[in-house]
Design a protein with these regions (language model features):
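Helix-loop-helix junctions within the multi-pass membrane cores of secondary transporters/permeases
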Residues: 2-36, 57, 78-87, 91-139, ...
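Loop-to-helix transition at the N-terminal end of transmembrane alpha-helices
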Residues: 44-63
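Alpha-helical membrane-protein architecture signal
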Residues: 12, 16, 191, 270-274, ...
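Helix-loop-helix hairpins and the membrane-proximal interhelical loops
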Residues: 1-49, 212-307, 451-454
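Helix-coil boundary and interhelical linker segments in multi-pass alpha-helical membrane proteins
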Residues: 38-49, 89-99, 266-270, 368-370, ...
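Juxtamembrane transmembrane-helix boundary signature
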Residues: 58-79, 110
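Hydrophobic/aromatic residues within the transmembrane alpha-helices of Major Facilitator Superfamily
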Residues: 23-30, 63, 67, 144, ...
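Membrane-embedded alpha-helical modules
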Residues: 93-214, 350-460
């Protein structure tokens, strides 16, 4: 049955590989179950209810990806989009979280229509192959940087970024942490990178997953030995699962279906809606391009078969997520970790979805996975994705420069969508001014996108 539905042999994989890949993807993105409630709670939303909404949105979205597209991609409420929701729309602009959820709901409906009418698919196919390869490389740098940041290996400083030290960490965050909380976690993360790297070199099956589990176990040993001292006030929690509150599922009642349609025709609402639309659209396209390129899923023309199903799953998940009570649900770049483990079909996504469903009942275990244990996985996956740099044509500067701009913009501006927009603008402008555009037959949609991106930078 699995073979028939997921076409395992056709995709050169097997059930064991797919399940392991699904577990790996879940382990690298399980942090969202802890981080999203924390961010959304800043708006006054019930954190327990947001945890339930987050797990359910991830479960529904990832399952839809498997059913609609048979791809190994996982979905969950997106980082960055949740921060925009909480700190810009609600706290910064003064709107209620119910109003912000309504904008997310409207975005989902619009995306469903765009997906059904092939607009999103057309945008995906309009991007030149060189830029698609650049997106993959840029995402590799981006998620490697996220991993280093999550592990506090790099911290803010006078040069914007610098190598970790306890003093530098304290100055950057305005806290008084010590070696026994932040310092030891950095050492554990570095050890995790080395351990995971060795497992990769030795070609150990499930190397990324094993890297996460070994690093977490080392942390628990350090906690028992007194080398790691939890401090909840500073964000350093016990590495042991907390079953003191049992295994009950937090109620959704405080946030379920709390949409507020009053004032949706205001200019502010349109601006908020457009921001959600823009970031989600190009983050999703960027993730699909990057991860698909790494998995060799793109056809000879650089197109992704069944992309309509993938985009529709993303759109429907966002709509359901808003009703459940969480910010935009989107395709996660951490899906690359499962792809790196050999995941090629929807069975990987089904496995990840099931684990998100189980997390509702086993939240203490999943919430205990620390960021320093998942950080090495992100760093190593970044290495995997960098390999696509060999597909970029560096002999043609009209191709190389836009690719370069796209690559460096993602980590430097901390945004996949900004990298894509700058890559598209530079590609169109350079090829148009140099006269290369005629020979390359650049898609008309690329010109439209470039103009829209320029207008965005001018007016938003």
């Amino acid at each position: 049955m699995l073979e028939k539905f997921f076409k395992l042999s056709e995709n050169h994989t097997d059930a064991k590989t797919e399940i392991l890949a699904g577990i790996t993807t879940f382990m690298t993105m399980a942090y969202i179950l802890a981080v999203n409630p924390s961010i959304m709670a800043a708006t006054g939303m019930d954190s327990g209810a947001v945890f339930t909404a987050t797990a359910l949105a991830a479960f529904i979205g990832t399952l839809l990806m498997a059913i609609f597209a048979n791809y190994p991609f996982a979905l969950a409420p997106g980082m960055g989009l949740n921060a925009y929701f909480a700190y810009t729309v609600v706290i910064g602009m003064g709107y209620t979280w119910q109003y912000a959820l309504t904008a997310v709901f409207a975005e989902g409906i619009i995306f469903i229509l765009l997906s059904l009418t092939n607009v999103r698919e057309a945008i995906f196919n309009a991007i030149p192959m060189n830029l698609k390869s650049a997106v993959s490389v840029g995402i590799g740098l981006f998620i490697a940087f996220v991993g280093l940041q999550n592990a506090h290996i790099v911290v803010g400083g006078s040069t914007l970024l610098q190598l970790f030290s306890v003093d530098a960490y304290n100055k950057a965050n305005g806290v008084e942490a010590s070696f026994n909380n932040v310092g030891i976690t950095v050492i554990l993360a570095l050890a995790g990178i080395i351990i995971t790297g060795i497992l990769v070199v030795k070609n150990i099956k499930g190397n990324i997953l094993w890297g996460i589990l070994i690093t977490w176990t080392l942390g628990i040993i350090c906690q028992f030995a007194g080398l790691y001292v939890p401090n909840a006030d500073l964000g350093f929690y016990s590495l042991l699962p907390d079953f003191s509150k049992g295994l009950s599922i937090p109620s959704l009642t405080p946030i379920f279906g709390k949409l507020q349609f009053k004032g949706i025709f205001s200019v502010d609402f349109i601006v908020i809606l457009f921001a959600f639309l823009f970031v989600d659209l190009f983050d999703t396209i960027g993730t699909l391009v990057g991860v698909s390129a790494k998995a060799d899923m793109l056809d000879e023309e650089g197109k992704l078969p069944h992309i309509k199903g993938a985009l529709l799953a993303d759109a429907v998940a966002t709509t359901f997520g808003a009703i459940l009570g969480t910010s935009t649900t989107t395709t996660f770049v951490e899906s690359a970790s499962g792809v790196s483990e050999g995941g090629r079909t929807g069975l990987t996504a089904v496995t990840t979805a099931i684990l998100f469903g189980l997390s509702l009942f086993l939240s203490p275990i999943f919430l205990a996975i620390p960021s320093f244990a998942t950080a090495p996985a992100l760093v190593i996956v970044g290495l995997y994705m960098l390999s696509n740099v060999t597909n970029i044509n560096f002999t043609d500067m009209s191709e190389a420069i836009p690719a370069y701009v796209c690559i460096i913009a993602m980590p430097f501006f901390y945004s996949i969508s900004e990298g894509i927009s700058m890559g598209i603008i530079s590609y169109v402008v350079i090829n148009l001014i140099t006269g290369e555009a005629k020979d390359k037959k650049i898609s008309a949609l690329m010109y439209v996108l470039a103009i829209l991106f320029i207008l965005k930078y001018i007016f938003l």
